[in-house]
Amino acid sequence: MYRQQSFITLDQFYEWRPLSRLEALLSFIDFTLLEQFFRYDPHKRGPKGYSWKCLLLALIAMQVEQIATVKALVQRLRSDPVFKRCLGFGYLDRTPSESTLNRFVSLLAGTDVLEKTFRRMVCRARKLGLVDGANVAIDSSKLTAYEHAVPKSRIPENNPAFPNWGGKLDTNGNFIKWFGWKMHALVDTYSGMPISYVITPANVADMDIAEPLIQKMMDDYDREIHPKYYMMDAGYDKPELYANIYTKFHGQAIIPINWRNTKLPPEGINMEGQLVCTMNYPYVYGGNDNGTIRLLCPHACGKCDCPMGSAWCSPSNTGYVGKVKIKDDPRFITSPFRGTPAFEKLYNQRTSVERTFGDLKDNYNLDNIRVAKMARVKVFMDLSCIALLASRLSDAVGKDKSKAA
């Protein structure tokens, strides 16, 4: 039996085959800032080493292909020549070692070039109409540390870069506890793409990070993104946060009321956080005039059957009409009103941030942290977000080409 000789080379096969999802995704990575940071020095002597671009593509492919460890990534590069060629390496080139990739991760951990690259890609998505920025959702997600868990008594008090213990309620109401970090993300509800994010130890409260995260978004994009509504869960219910979002960022916080240990609401407010009349019926929203809300009598509007009638509050045939300003108390005076379908419709958009976290963890390896120290964890967080954004850009451009065809 004679072995038939192939009529095409491996390079020809690679050029003729259809473009894979990984290659399409990697083609949308913006290397502009990375090329400036890893500038080639022709006068440098010694071994040339590996291409920084190939090393970076290998780390991004590790997140996309959900490869568990750097060691497994090296084994994949050695055993899969097509995968190796997709990342820019030649078939006969030496494969980078595990130590080489770990040193490259440490190099990236000392810079913010990956986060700046992510922001450039967000700006590109905005130009393509993928990111709206009018409504955003904020939430946090747990990341378990790779370090061994230690008791609280052994955690340094003055080290904000050390992992800590955190706890929260899951979707079923069960309390979960973990040792590690939190990823706080601000997500565009229109596209489900993250716009800004930070990492903190797990013991940091969500409400304390919301305002710095919004300020970071404003600074990163030179205030080109102006969200009108900020959707958050009840854990962010903090009076100062409402006021700062309204006065500093000119937006409206959409957050359910969390009374915590309060037994009775303030006067003129019911337990749902709605403004009520003297008979404890919620006022009807009458419109917003440049921050001034008109309050209409619920009996006159047919929303309730008040035993006192509309004459109890006003002799007018149209009933009582009042005015309040949002700036006086943005927590309770909102536009739209709490309890209205418009308010609920806005708040339902908050689930977009949960879907984004699920996408990052299920499809881009964010739930598989195998490095220690906050700066190195941040590198893999950046890589996952860049991979997610590149995937969305690739899908959007591919759909446009299909429609044009």
PLM ranges: what are they?
Residues 19-61, 65, 102:
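Basic, short loop/linker segments at the boundary and entry of helix-turn-helix/winged-helix-like folds
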Residues 41-47, 199, 371-373:
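A short glycine/serine-rich beta->alpha loop
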Residues 1-36, 314, 396-405:
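Charged, often Cys/His-bearing segments associated with DNA-binding zinc-finger transcription factors
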Residues 36-38, 191, 332-339, 361-367:
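Short acidic (Asp/Glu) and glycine-rich catalytic loops that position anionic groups and cofactors
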Residues 98, 102-247, 256-261:
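Polybasic low-complexity intrinsically disordered regions
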Residues 343-405:
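Basic, amphipathic alpha-helical segments enriched in Lys/Arg and hydrophobic/aromatic residues
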Residues 48-116:
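Short, positively charged, Gly/Tyr-enriched micro-motifs
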Residues 243-358:
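Helix-centered, glycine/charged polyanion-binding patches within enzymatic domains
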